[in-house]
């Protein structure tokens, strides 16, 4: 198994030195879901929630979060993102909203944490905007779907 890179030989946490790594095109895609009551789902779907356009605000929140990841995750490098795309898939049968965030850069370190942070904040924003009518919403299935670029190459989640 590969050693954890955020610890030195004495076991102390440190930010990994990426200075000698080649700048390459990096891409990451992450996803997650929030499940709610059917009536809450209808408010989200129809854009009629009391606080406004839930999906639109969640999209902006995801983009903002990707850009602030290094401020939230202690050992993440600040990254100049070149692209952030946020998609939502609404599944009426299960009253579930899925969020997919794709992040891109040309740099020396990956953008997986940015994609994952964007997903989490988008889903938390949906929760915040709908909690007045449904405190039982469940956020889950947050995961990295794929990453491309860098020394470790490409990776895709199974299934």
Swiss-Prot record:
InterPro entries: MoaC, MoaC_bact/euk, MoaC_sf, MoCo_biosynth_MoaA/MoaC, Mopterin_CF_biosynth-C_dom. One of its GO terms (biological process) is Mo-molybdopterin cofactor biosynthetic process. Keywords: Lyase, Molybdenum cofactor biosynthesis. Substrate binds at residues 75-77, 113-114. Pathway: Cofactor biosynthesis; molybdopterin biosynthesis. Catalyzes the conversion of (8S)-3',8-cyclo-7,8-dihydroguanosine 5'-triphosphate to cyclic pyranopterin monophosphate (cPMP). Homohexamer; trimer of dimers. This is Cyclic pyranopterin monophosphate synthase. The lineage of its organism: Bacteria, Pseudomonadati, Pseudomonadota, Betaproteobacteria, Burkholderiales. The gene is moaC.
